[in-house]
């Protein structure tokens, strides 16, 4: 790309010899071309496409040249922008077969699409093989119906031959359509199970006896037969089981005594008919596995029994292979709400006695209403966890006895949105934080265990002198911490008191179990392995496949663990005075920039923060390259921008240009489109100079010259001062003044005249360096007690007062304005800019 930059007038940049102007233009064009080549690939595509168009040159037609390839870009864009891809030709060869009728094809331009030969559907995105929620429900309903019709009992390992024949006949007479549908459904079953598993945790609900169950290929793909590892018992969810009565006509088993009884493992007998691809020999092995030795024990209530049947989601994980694993003593933990931190340690909770059947419940104690009221994870012999009350309460720590406090401190009340459950008091920041966001809840600010707590009314001595005293609830937890609670009014406080009293009265005492507490004084953290660590290690050996490793336990992810309470209670909270003293000590001992420079730790930047003499000596020029490039870019991209040099640019973009310039890389500067970022970088360059453009030793002389009433005397004095400037400062000043005059020439568009630009650049070009500014800042922040050291007093310039500082800034702006207006009158400023040494 070729960019031509022409001067706007004879007094502009490069108004001198043609060689200087030509060298600058060539250098600027090289930078612009490098930036254009690396800026975007789209421009190269358009250029290459334009070059491939047929054209004639010197009477020669390149259309017949086989070395040239021609493409209609408009047709390509039109094809790619279609919402539906084209239908493949009959003779088109697919790239691959995705099964289920889907094939992958490729268009003429190389874009892939997917086509179903059975339905004729064509789409750009790959098929997901997942059904709608309605189809999933229908699929589960059909699978449940098939299980109900094929479920049967086996009373012992030696079943009657009549029942075996009956099962074989039922299996052989099953509808072929149903079998094919089940086989097809297996391909999408994993996706369906993923959606179901997100709502419930993995289910293991077994007897306390060992139960060897072979697992399916879905859990052992690409795994070694020896790749098994012990895992802890998973959390069983009641939502994964359905309660259905057992028909006594087909689900009875005979015993030696002639008493009919339903077997607790009867649901396993339906696997043979549910999975049509299973082998008969494997089915026989499973039948011998799942029937325990005590299967012939009698039951007194053969007809009043309900059996829990696993859902289709769990049946998917069972197949008929020789790989067997043992599940033993898997407990059923009490699952508290997602914001809770631990499980209940009730004595019956970890009971693993054989006389507690897990898969059988007495229908006399079971009602549909009680089933609906149960929460997930409610164990046997426990009250289901539910929410009692919720609302806003104010809390405060009561760490001092009221009768012993002579001058009590003012209490700090914190408002929380609290949930009172049957076991805990959960604290949230507000009601919005307590709501469910997607599939998860936010972590609470605290969870208080109410076991062993006490609830009493509290009378505060601070309210004795008041006419109307408020009601305070004192809640003392089992860890001896006391909190005061108060509601918006006394009525709600009384209701909260009654609810808390009822909950605490029903809860058992903590006893000897040390349950971890979650308190608002401790940090709340999530630990995925917390629930697993609180349960006893089971003897389960389950092969871990890739899918099981990838999907974590959702209940483990929602577990909450606190930081050690001993650390937070032993260390007192630091006071404000302690923090201030530590900060003062840090700032006093912090090394200065000068000491770091002397040690070589801090090195000045090559462009920003250096001096003009050092920069020009490094670049072997009289004007820094950064000034030459950035003024050219600003003039080429937009001098008509409103508020140029007055509006601040993005600081991060300015710092990016600064870092790139320090590395002698100006591509970011050329590619920057925001004019205000470029002008901000230019102002930052002059502001960061260690020695300003106008040397500090000449500041007073410039100020006195500006105050001269005679114009002729003032002009001669300024001409003398300009001649005393160093060569680098003088040539840089000439280039800057000419650039600012070009900006002022477009004042009708950018509204920046010469006096406006002088106000901006006056303090920038006449700054006093870093020493005085830093010392003034230190004295202002430290106060009267902080005194600078003797070394700083000798080196630093005296601090200016506010009135003197304002006067200096006004004079500096007037000096810059005078130089802008008289730039064409001074012979030194009219001379061409000498860039090279």
From Swiss-Prot:
**Sample GO molecular function, one term:** GTPase activator activity
Name the UniProt key words of this record, in alphabetical order.
GTPase activation
Q: Sorted alphabetically, which SMART domains does this protein's record hold?
A: PH (SM00233), RhoGAP (SM00324), WW (SM00456)
Compositional bias, Basic and acidic residues, is annotated for 162-181, 371-403
What cellular component GO annotations does this protein have? cytoplasm; plasma membrane
Residues forming the PH domain are 386-505
Q: Which residue numbers delimit the Rho-GAP domain?
A: 610-827
Where does this protein have compositionally biased stretches of type Basic residues?
778-788
Q: Where is the composition biased (Polar residues)?
A: 1-11, 44-61, 247-257, 556-569
Q: Which InterPro entries match?
A: PH-like_dom_sf, PH_domain, Rho-GAP, Rho_GTPase_activation_prot, RhoGAP_dom, WW_dom, WW_dom_sf
BP GO terms, sorted: small GTPase-mediated signal transduction
Which portions of the sequence form the region Disordered? Answer: 1-66, 150-181, 194-257, 338-403, 548-574, 778-800
Top-rank taxon, per record: Eukaryota
Q: Where is the composition biased (Low complexity)?
A: 33-43, 150-161
Where does the WW domain lie? 96-129
List the residues marked with site Arginine finger.
Answer: 646
Write down what this protein is called: WW domain-containing protein tag-325
Give the organism, scientific name: Caenorhabditis elegans
């Amino acid at each position: 790309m070729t960019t031509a930059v022409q001067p706007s007038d004879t007094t502009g940049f490069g108004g001198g010899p043609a060689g200087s102007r030509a060298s600058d233009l060539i250098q600027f064009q090289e930078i612009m071309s490098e930036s254009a080549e690396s800026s975007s690939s789209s421009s190269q595509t358009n250029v290459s496409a334009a070059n491939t168009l047929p054209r004639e040159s010197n009477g020669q037609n390149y259309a017949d040249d086989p070395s040239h390839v021609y493409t209609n870009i408009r047709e390509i864009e039109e094809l790619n922008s279609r919402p539906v891809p084209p239908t493949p030709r009959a003779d088109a060869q697919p790239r691959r077969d995705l099964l289920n009728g889907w094939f992958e094809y490729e268009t003429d331009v190389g874009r892939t699409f997917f086509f179903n030969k059975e339905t004729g559907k064509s789409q750009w995105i790959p098929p997901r093989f997942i059904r709608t929620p309605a189809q999933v429900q229908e699929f589960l309903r059909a699978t449940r119906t098939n299980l109900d019709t094929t479920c049967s009992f086996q009373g012992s390992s030696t079943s009657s031959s009549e029942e075996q024949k009956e099962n074989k006949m039922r299996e052989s007479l099953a509808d072929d359509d149903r079998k094919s549908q089940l086989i097809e459904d297996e391909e999408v079953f994993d996706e369906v199970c993923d959606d179901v598993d997100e709502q419930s945790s993995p289910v293991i609900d077994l007897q306390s006896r060992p139960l060897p169950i072979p697992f399916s290929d879905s859990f052992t793909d690409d795994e070694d037969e020896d790749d098994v590892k012990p895992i802890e018992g998973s959390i069983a969810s009641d939502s994964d089981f359905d309660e259905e009565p057992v028909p006594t006509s087909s689900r009875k088993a005979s015993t030696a005594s002639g008493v009919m009884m339903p077997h607790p493992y009867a649901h396993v007998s339906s696997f043979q008919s549910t999975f049509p691809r299973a082998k008969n020999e494997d089915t026989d092995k499973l039948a011998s596995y799942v029937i325990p030795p005590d299967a012939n024990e009698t039951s007194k209530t053969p007809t009043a029994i309900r059996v829990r049947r696993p859902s289709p989601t769990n049946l998917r994980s069972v197949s008929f292979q020789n790989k067997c694993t043992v599940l033993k003593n898997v407990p059923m933990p009490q699952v508290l709400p997602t914001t809770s931190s631990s499980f209940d340690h009730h004595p019956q909770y970890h009971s693993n006695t054989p006389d507690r059947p897990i898969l059988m419940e007495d229908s006399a104690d079971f009602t549909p209403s009680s089933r609906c009221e149960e929460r997930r994870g409610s164990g046997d012999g426990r009250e289901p966890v539910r929410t009692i009350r919720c609302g806003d309460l104010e809390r405060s720590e009561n760490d001092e006895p009221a009768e012993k406090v002579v001058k009590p401190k003012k209490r700090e009340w914190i408002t929380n949105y609290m949930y009172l459950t049957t076991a805990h008091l959960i604290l949230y920041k507000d009601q919005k934080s307590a709501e469910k966001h997607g599939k998860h809840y936010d972590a609470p600010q605290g969870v208080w265990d109410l076991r062993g707590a006490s609830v009493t009314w509290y009378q505060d001595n601070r309210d004795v002198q008041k006419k109307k005293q408020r009601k305070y609830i004192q809640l003392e937890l089992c860890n001896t911490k006391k909190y005061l609670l108060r509601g918006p009014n006394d009525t709600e406080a009384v209701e909260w008191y009654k609810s808390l009293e009822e909950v605490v009265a029903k809860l058992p005492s903590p006893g000897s179990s040390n349950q971890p507490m979650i308190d608002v004084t401790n940090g709340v953290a999530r630990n995925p392995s917390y629930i697993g660590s609180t349960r006893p290690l089971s003897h389960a050996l389950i092969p871990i496949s890739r899918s099981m490793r990838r999907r974590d336990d959702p209940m483990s992810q929602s577990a909450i663990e606190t930081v050690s309470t001993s650390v937070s209670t032993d260390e007192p909270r630091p006071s404000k005075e302690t923090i201030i003293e530590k900060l003062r000590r840090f700032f006093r001992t912090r090394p200065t920039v000068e000491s770091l420079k002397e040690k070589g730790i801090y090195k000045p930047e090559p462009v920003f923060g250096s001096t003009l003499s050092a920069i020009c000596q490094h670049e072997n020029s009289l004007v820094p390259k950064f000034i030459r490039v950035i003024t050219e870019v600003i003039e080429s991209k937009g001098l008509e921008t409103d508020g140029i040099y007055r509006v601040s640019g993005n600081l991060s973009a300015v710092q990016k240009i600064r870092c790139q310039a320090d590395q002698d890389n100006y591509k970011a500067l050329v590619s920057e489109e925001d004019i205000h970022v470029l002008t901000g970088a230019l102002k930052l360059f002059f502001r960061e100079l260690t020695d300003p453009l106008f040397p500090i030793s000449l500041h007073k002389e410039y100020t006195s010259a500006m105050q001269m009433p005679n114009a002729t005397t003032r002009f001669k004095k300024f001409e003398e001062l300009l001649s005393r400037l160093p060569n680098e400062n003088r040539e840089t000043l000439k280039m800057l003044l000419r650039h600012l005059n070009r900006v002022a020439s477009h004042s009708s568009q950018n509204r920046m005249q010469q006096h406006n630009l002088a106000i901006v650049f006056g303090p920038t070009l006449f700054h006093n360096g870093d020493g005085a500014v830093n010392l003034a800042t230190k004295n202002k922040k430290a106060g009267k007690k902080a005194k600078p050291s003797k070394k700083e007093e000798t080196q630093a310039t005296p601090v200016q007062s506010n009135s003197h500082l304002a006067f200096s800034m006004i004079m500096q702006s007037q000096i810059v304005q005078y130089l802008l207006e008289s730039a064409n009158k001074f012979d030194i400023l009219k001379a061409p800019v000498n860039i090279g040494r």
